[in-house]
């Protein structure tokens, strides 16, 4: 069972992330054109985006991770696909902003676009949407528009967004980068006008 695996503790993760960022910056100190003051500022990060590498709420210590970032005066952003409803509901440490990805207006498109590996993924997402308004932090629905895949049925999106009652809605275009290129092409990238339509 994956929940029985060993995981790094939050302090180790944060210290490792800061160290990794500092390692990336070290080469810039040899550049005469680099702004040393800005480089020194970058060595002491103050923002953390907990996202991109899968579902962050799968990490069993996500609440403690957010709490440790908060103790270090970080502004913390968490991006979730809403699959670990109980973990979201049980957060005691609020991130500065909680994003919930909503990339389909209905279950059929959700199953095609998101390709969930669990049977109740659509139900989980909807439960997370219903939970979103209970957070004390800022909340945001994030929608990635994929041309030819999920840019339809705006009235269904509207109902889901109303259910969540977020502070913000962020609509953005899909970018053909990373492993998504294995299943999508540049033709799936909508233009700005198509996104705002």
List the predicted regions and their residue ranges.
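C-terminal accessory regions of radical SAM enzymes
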Residues: 195-197
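Conserved AdoMet/S-adenosylmethionine-binding subsite of the radical SAM
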Residues: 14-15, 22-193
